[in-house]
Amino acid sequence: MIQRLGSSLVKFKSKIAGAIWRNLDDKLTEVVSLKDFGAKGDGKTNDQDAVNAAMASGKRIDGAGATYKVSSLPDMERFYNTRFVWERLAGQPLYYVSKGFINGELYKITDNPYYNAWPQDKAFVYENVIYAPYMGSDRHGVSRLHVSWVKSGDDGQTWSTPEWLTDMHPDYPTVNYHCMSMGVCRNRLFAMIETRTLAKNELTNCALWDRPMSRSLHLTGGITKAANQRYATIHVPDHGLFVGDFVNFSNSAVTGVSGDMKVATVIDKDNFTVLTPNQQTSDLNNAGKNWHMGTSFHKSPWRKTDLGLIPRVTEVHSFATIDNNGFVMGYHQGDVAPREVGLFYFPDAFNSPSNYVRRQIPSEYEPDAAEPCIKYYDGVLYLITRGTRGDRLGSSLHRSRDIGQTWESLRFPHNVHHTTLPFAKVGDDLIMFGSERAENEWEAGAPDDRYKASYPRTFYARLNVNNWNADDIEWVNITDQIYQGDIVNSSVGVGSVVVKDSFIYYIFGGENHFNPMTYGDNKDKDPFKGHGHPTDIYCYKMQIANDNRVSRKFTYGATPGQAIPTFMGTDGIRNIPAPLYFSDNIVTEDTKVGHLTLKASTSANIRSEMQMEGEYGFIGKSVPKDKPTGQRLIICGGEGTSSSSGAQITLHGSNSSNAKRITYNGNEHLFQGAPIMPAVDNQFAAGGPSNRFTTIYLGSDPVTTSDADHKYGISSINTKVLKAWSRVGFKQYGLNSEAERNLDSIHFGVLAQDIVAAFEAEGLDAIKYGIVSFEEGRYGVRYSEVLILEAAYTRHRLDKLEEMYATNKIS
């Protein structure tokens, strides 16, 4: 509604309820346009004066989506929907965009003390999930390195906890694993796993590892099982599975094909078998039945194909799927001249994973080029290299319609790209991304300032593949000022690009300027000391097409529950404040714990459990509330508490039903290097009445202490004892315990009951004399005393005979 108030005054009022009359001039100057100040906005005419005048107005400035050439960059926060072109170095134009010109957001997708870097050109989308592989270590190199990834199932808004894909190399710390090339072909993840030395990061071996990705299939028919057979045949087109891979079945309608199973044999690319626990008398076929099958990445083994030390290779980079059977990986050689850049083509990775073809880009582009990024679209292979020096051009773009046998090539003008240029094809455009290692490094001739605190820039560019001309390519600065927690960033690592729905994702690594390779607070290079190495992975998400969904954005309002709170102690070591409760299995490595209480209910007799890699300890320090008499510690060399899994020692607590008992359980008990002795002299027995040894094997006679200083009541043997002994006869017999073991040995000895009866006949108590024992309802004898008494009795009789000869009582 407009009202004429005079010849020069115009007022208006909005139709919105409650609105008032306003001066039209006031309304028009709320947001000013650069065009109001004479700017051309054609990207060629210098609009610096118009920009200065607009900024002097103090108003917010709308660029109306145009590009304005300037001789110095203005305050970008004052502008909306504006792009500037500025030549910081003459002849090297760069473009800078304000809010509203590009719809993009930056996310930090890892946050831990490891040196998280190298996501180069190996990110991918599988089953609507974005996978961002990278490597996490404790420094630049392979020290404590794990090949890892994070995943996002919500379009990059939240990311998973990092998952390790490799353990330490068996020969660590001499060598360790490393990976710069990874991707999915059909339904398997393929990765070039390099082995490198810790000392020099030198490549010593290459191996192609592959493993099925996790997925869920809803199928109809295709399972058969013949009568009187345990094997069932599964038909799944292009299953991509190998022997030993994990599969899970439900609702199969075929006996035995259910739950977790493993691939038994592979018939062809569409059929495999599983071994069921049973067989039936008739043929089975689930034709027409709906059923489900799942595969698992983590539960399946790696298939590892050793490729040895590939000659003329510094690193293998990037990955591009060619078809359902093969893929390519890029590589470069920069250790010795001449430099080499190219690809490895694996035409049949499923059946012949060790077979590959090596191809190079044109030789004139190889000097000072490195780390190729590779993609394959519609029968065309694209490859982009990065430059390695600031004084010479190195970045180049190549395409091939015959997988690297012939090439069409372009050189990027002006700019030197010290990081890789990952890309994706959207429509007819290649959309490329790259980040500086240090602020103002993008242009040719820039110094190497990686180890200074700065604000490295991130750029993107479009190149139309139909025009195939890089002379007028526009590098657009989309974000900078990356931070690593509390420290300004310096270096930015190599990246990956993927497209999902209406968005393109640039995933790249940042780096703390206190680079652990050289200097800084953390000279020990320990990721768990101080703040570790705040080197993390970022994702820049940019909209590239209209999205027909109502909204795919949300605010993450949940309380984070996947991380343990830590605090920096006064000693520079991160601390977890006690108490801390764990409700599931705990796996630790190089852990120092002052006091640890574990509570678990693994069985009725076990209060607490501690599980270590390859060894087990079950702890019952405190009295178990559910069963106090079960207090004990079990140490088992096997994989459980049962002695059948390995040798075992059980230590009973004072409240145990077998208080303070130690039980040893094993096939052998061997002692090495020292004598076996009791802690206290002459206090304890070896064995007991109900815990007897079958026999003892000795190398010599045992020694029994017979020192007179250790005896009392010394006298000659009573003649009544000798007379009683004369009543004891020697016997031969078999042993019941041996008969139970099907042994039939004849033994010689005395019977304890005969000794007791003989002594009683002379009015003596055999138990008192110690030659006979009676404990726990069982008689025993001391054969050393039996022999002594027999010898004494024999001597006694001989003495009597000699006396009779001497007195002529016998002759």
Curated annotation (Swiss-Prot):
UniProt keyword list: Degradation of host capsule during virus entry, Degradation of host cell envelope components during virus entry, Glycosidase, Host-virus interaction, Hydrolase, Repeat, Viral attachment to host adhesion receptor, Viral attachment to host cell, Viral tail fiber protein, Viral tail protein, Virion, Virus entry into host cell
GO cellular component annotations of the record: virus tail, fiber
Bilayer-spanning residue ranges: none
SUPFAM superfamilies: Phage fibre proteins, Sialidases
Biological processes, Gene Ontology terms: adhesion receptor-mediated virion attachment to host cell; symbiont entry into host cell via disruption of host cell envelope; symbiont entry into host cell via disruption of host cell glycocalyx
Keyword Repeat appears in the UniProt entry: yes
InterPro entries assigned to the protein according to its UniProt record, in alphabetical order: ATP_synth_asu-like_sf, Endosialidase_beta_barrel, Endosialidase_beta_prop, Endosialidase_C_dom, Endosialidase_C_dom_sf, Endosialidase_N-extension, Glycl_Hydrolase_58, S74_ICA
Annotated catalytic residues: 371, 386, 437
Gene Ontology MF term list: endo-alpha-(2,8)-sialidase activity
Top-tier EC class: hydrolase
Peptidase S74 domain sequence ranges: 706-808
Annotated site location: Binding to sialic acid: 332, 335, 339, 368, 388-389
BNR repeat start-end pairs: 150-161, 286-293, 398-409
Domain of life of the source: Viruses
EC number assigned by the record: 3.2.1.129
Site location (Cleavage): 706-707
Family: Belongs to the glycosyl hydrolase 58 family.
Protein name: Tail spike protein
Species assigned in the record: Escherichia phage K1E (Bacteriophage K1E)
